């Protein structure tokens, strides 16, 4: 009976199983170990414990080590539980005070900006009164300037009229007539004419100076006003 022939594998050609390295071994070990998060145990307080803790917190927010131990013994709690509760309660109280302060500050700011009565502020009326008063002052000043300018213009015009009056021209005409004498005229006649012309010129100049004074102007204006009133 023939036996099956078994193939003999040569050591040089037969594949060898690869052995894992140390890095691969450590990686597999890490994968096998799944990290487990420790869940914090939350303390559940009874209503009686909460009443005692809140009452003590209202009276005293910071407790000493001895006071916390006494309170934990009374409430059948651990020292750490009492300490954690007081810390959390203090943080809540500070947050609540901060929120209320922000709300109150916003309310005060809006109250200042909004005017519920609907009346205009006092400074607007003062501004209107000041502007009205300034307009009246400007009108008074403009009227006074107008009156002063009118008087000055009248004085100047009167001076010009007095200076350019026919009396002054008459003096010039007399001088011109004297200068137009013929050279054959006697010397005595020429001297007499010059003296007469000089006296007339002095009289005219004095008259013009008199009428150019402010007192004469006032009298003239009053006289003209009275004459106009009588005509009416």
From Swiss-Prot:
Bias kind Basic and acidic residues: ranges: 26-35
SUPFAM superfamilies, per database record: Homeodomain-like
Region (Sufficient for strong transactivation activity): 168-232
Gene Ontology molecular functions: DNA-binding transcription factor activity, RNA polymerase II-specific; RNA polymerase II cis-regulatory region sequence-specific DNA binding
Location(s), subcellular: Nucleus
InterPro entries: Distal-less_Homeobox_TF, HD, Homeobox_CS, Homeodomain-like_sf
Keyword set, alphabetical order: DNA-binding, Homeobox, Nucleus, Repeat, Transcription, Transcription regulation
Segments of skewed composition (Polar residues): 11-25
Cellular component aspect of the GO annotation: nucleus
Region annotation (Sufficient for transactivation activity) ranges: 123-167
UniProt Sequence repeat ranges: 123-127, 128-132, 133-137, 143-147, 148-152, 153-157, 158-162, 163-167
Keyword Transcription regulation assigned: yes
Domain of life: Eukaryota
Region (8 X repeats starting with a Trp in each unit): 123-167
Spans annotated as Disordered: 1-39
Function as written in the Swiss-Prot or TrEMBL entry: Probable transcriptional regulator.
PANTHER family: HOMEOBOX PROTEIN (PTHR24327), HOMEOBOX PROTEIN NANOG-RELATED (PTHR24327:SF79)
Family of this protein: Belongs to the Nanog homeobox family.
Protein name: Putative homeobox protein NANOG2
Originating organism: Pan paniscus (Pygmy chimpanzee)
Gene: NANOGP1
């Amino acid at each position: 009976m023939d036996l099956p022939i078994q193939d003999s594998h040569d050591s040089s050609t037969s594949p060898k199983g690869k052995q894992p390295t140390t890095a691969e071994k450590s990686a597999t070990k890490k994968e096998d170990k799944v990290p487990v998060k420790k869940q914090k145990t939350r303390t559940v307080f009874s209503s009686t414990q909460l009443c005692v803790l809140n009452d003590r917190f209202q009276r005293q927010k910071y407790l000493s080590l001895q006071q916390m131990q006494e309170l934990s013994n009374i409430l059948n709690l651990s020292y750490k539980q009492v300490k954690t509760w007081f810390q959390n309660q203090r943080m809540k109280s500070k947050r609540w005070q901060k929120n209320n302060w922000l709300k109150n500050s916003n309310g005060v700011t809006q109250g200042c900006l909004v005017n519920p009565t609907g009346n205009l502020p006092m400074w607007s009326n003062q501004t209107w009164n000041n502007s009205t008063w300034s307009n009246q002052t400007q009108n008074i000043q403009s009227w006074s300037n107008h009156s002063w300018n009118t008087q000055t213009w009248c004085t100047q015009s009167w001076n010009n009229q007095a200076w350019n009056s026919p009396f002054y021209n008459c003096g010039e005409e007399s001088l011109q007539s004297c200068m137009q004498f013929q050279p054959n005229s006697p010397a005595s006649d020429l001297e007499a004419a010059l003296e007469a012309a000089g006296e007339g010129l002095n009289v005219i100049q004095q008259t013009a100076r008199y009428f150019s004074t402010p007192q004469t102007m006032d009298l003239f204006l009053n006289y003209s006003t009275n004459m106009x009133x009588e005509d009416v």
